Amino acid sequence: MKNGVKQISFLSLIGLSLIGLSLTNIAWAKVARPKNDTLTNTIQSAELKTSSFSSMPKKEIPNRHIISLSKSQLAQHPRLVLRGLILALYQNNTQAVQLLLPLYKQFPQHDNFLLTWAKAIDAREQGDLTQSIAYYRELFALDASLLPLRYQLAQALFFNYENESAKIQFEKLRTEVDDEKFLGVIDQYLLTLNQRNQWIWQVGLNFLNDDNLNNAPKSGTKIGSWTAWEKESGKGGRVFFISRKKWPWADHFFSKTMFNGNGKYYWDNKKYNEATLRIGGGLGYQTALVEVSLFPFQEKRWYAGGSSGTNTMKQYADKLGIRLENVDWLSKTWQISTALEYGESRYKIRKHLDGNYYFISSTLFYLPKSTQFWFVGMDFHRENTQALDNAYQQKTLRLGWGQDWSYGISSRLTFSYANRVYREKDLIGIQQKNREYATTITLWHRNIHFMGLTPKLSWDYQKSTSNHAFYRYDKNRIYLEIGKIF
């Protein structure tokens, strides 16, 4: 160093070449976004140390393209600093970001997006992963289309052991990467995530305001001398949780334990309070692209009894069954998820509902890009009960679309149509045949969180048409939902 001034091999440091680049083409707020950019560089393993965030190899630059500048000299070239910072951010180059950020801050004009991105990388390198992830989510609320940004967020989530969130980001990233070498890197991350043996939790809360809890038809509906029940309303909340843990074995095999639970509580109509808990465990096989599992389960349901019940929940029914699940990535943009379930039901009081059931579900997902998904699914459900007028067969078609928009807005739209046919006539002499429709629209902002919980606003509409007048109804509701995966 001459006169205490550090000399910087600038282009060597950030792995760039100025040959063929025109500095006059820099736009202050615009960043070029090639589909794969520098993501074709690879890492050796998904099991990286936390100090190796910027370990992706850079291309060798011939010596004739290296320019040595001091910091003071570099500070005289704001366009060069800007170009270097942008590419350092894209390349996930921590050393270059930490060098250029102080220089960039000295300039009279700053781009907040670039500053926040640089802060995210710096916080990550300092080991403050929680703050780094917060910065990345703030950036995602502004622009969810930048692939290097998604990769860096996925990395930070991975090293912070937010496994489920990291897996979602890597799977989205996989849909937009064409380079086979980098696809292999993503698959290594996914395989490592699948093999991690820690508990994963998903929790959520909905605020309920249902003006037709008992799915009553229009008031005054009659069939002969029979009169339909009247509507009942209720305000309250619904809570649900999913918890699971895997224990990896050799050769891609694993064992799994899972708990699912949900409950509804209406403070002004407690007769409709209910809760369900399912416990299961079994064996499975997984790679980065395929997961198959088979597990028996036991389920218990508590219910206050509905219109003829009390304000206290009591044990209502038990189920014992077995479930087979399969998830398979057919290609980088197509995934199929299938489930088969068989169970036997036993009711504490309503013995005429005892029996067994079969359930088959298959869903095909299409992810054309990381900010969008579509799905189509079909279900078959057969319920066999001792009283044949309660036994039925149902076929369901499901459609869905999810989208990350500009300005941090995300949306999800789902639609389903079901055809339900009962086996025998009821007491009135009608063999019930229903057509059931449901649609839900959900909106949320990607950068709005409260204690790690993301609020989502949903509108839900349900309609049932039937040859049985007592089972014709429609209702809609708007509710707030909050949830978290950790």
Swiss-Prot record:
Disulfide bridge map: none
Keyword Isomerase: no
Residues that span the membrane, as ranges: 199-209, 237-248, 253-262, 276-286, 290-300, 320-330, 334-344, 358-367, 373-382, 395-404, 409-419, 437-446, 453-463, 476-486
InterPro entries: Slam_C_b-barrel, TPR-like_helical_dom_sf
Recorded topology in the membrane: Multi-pass membrane protein
C-terminal probable beta barrel, as annotated region: 198-486
Record localization: Cell outer membrane
Protein family (similarity comment): Belongs to the Slam family.
Role: Required for correct export to the cell surface of some cell outer membrane lipoproteins (tested with TpbP) upon heterologous expression in E.coli and probably also in Haemophilus.
Listed name of the protein: Surface lipoprotein assembly modifier
Organism of provenance: Haemophilus influenzae (strain 86-028NP)
